[in-house]
């Protein structure tokens, strides 16, 4: 595995153990060139349904794209990276159980919003503001009113 510090192509595994959920392997590696250590996570590559975008394009599910969007919504909030990872793990679990070959991106977005609503309401509103593409302040205020009613 290529070293993230010096880009040397070889490293050795110094420790290997299952992660907390058992769905992945956490490995500590040491670069054979600069001797710096880094962590990698190995997980089974699942066959997930393709994501059907609003414009009709189809693309593979990208875990890091979802993580990035959620992290952006949770910026400067008391939401840990571990919480975000668990949220995305649950999302991937739902995708694995999805019975069709394609899943609309709108469905994934709604799942994320449902999860975020339970975790952090500010992160929920931030994610919704990007995901729902409010056309004006009135639409945004209507979403806030719905949130306050719940």
From Swiss-Prot:
Top-rank lineage group of the source organism: Bacteria
Cofactor dependency: Zn(2+)
Zn finger spans (unnamed): 3-34
UniProt keyword list: ATP-binding, DNA-binding, Metal-binding, Nucleotide-binding, Repressor, Transcription, Transcription regulation, Zinc, Zinc-finger
Domain ATP-cone: residue ranges: 49-139
Signal peptide: none
GO-annotated biological processes: negative regulation of DNA-templated transcription
One GO molecular-function entry: DNA binding
Pfam family, one: Zn_ribbon_NrdR
Textual note on the cofactor: Binds 1 zinc ion.
InterPro entries documented for this protein: ATP-cone_dom, NrdR-like_N, RNR_NrdR-like
Function: Negatively regulates transcription of bacterial ribonucleotide reductase nrd genes and operons by binding to NrdR-boxes.
Similarity comment: Belongs to the NrdR family.
Stated name of the protein: Transcriptional repressor NrdR
Organism of origin: Geobacter metallireducens (strain ATCC 53774 / DSM 7210 / GS-15)
